[in-house]
Amino acid sequence: MYEIFGKYIPNPPEFSPPQELLDEASRWTDTALWIVGRKSGGEECDRRLENDYYLSNQEKVLLEAICAHFPKVAVVLNGNGLMDLSWVEEHSQIQALLFLGVPGEEGPAALAELLVGKANPSGKLSVTIAKRRNDYPAWEDFSWDKDHPKQIKTYEDYGLIPPLVDRVFAHRPVTAYREDIYLGYRYFDSFGIEPLYPCLLYTSDAA
């Protein structure tokens, strides 16, 4: 028993709309809204790579179907953290991308106001979004695989002494933040790594 809080629950299967529904919808609108959801998870077991950080196979099929039917696509990310977004640049139909996060019970109402133009997100990007997961400096130290507890990195792997509470649960995931001052955009700028979306970005075409 190495887990005391939470248990990872995979995302439910994605709904696959029938072809006739897509055909009918594309006859009366040229715009599609796709909401990509992720569960918030539990403590120490929030994320996985397959079907979580990356799109699932079902989601990939749905994305291709949407882009094949609608020339304008808006994507809303509804989850507790970032995911791989390399597919956004690969589909020219995607013209808007909004990170909604986990906004709570009033989230849908706020989203509706943004979508119809009643409100403006009015914020600059507060994080750097990498092109590849390996571009994040903390990735190699991110210990997440609780399905294989013996592969989890512990305090001892970093030469650290665990706090008393963690000495009972030897295989609790530990991530060592060793970036020093090179956090976020400082790391990408200092080491010449081109991000997918830079931190603090407003727009590239403003006067």
Where are these regions (language model features)?
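C-terminal non-catalytic regions of proteins with extracellular/luminal or membrane-system context
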Residues: M1-A207
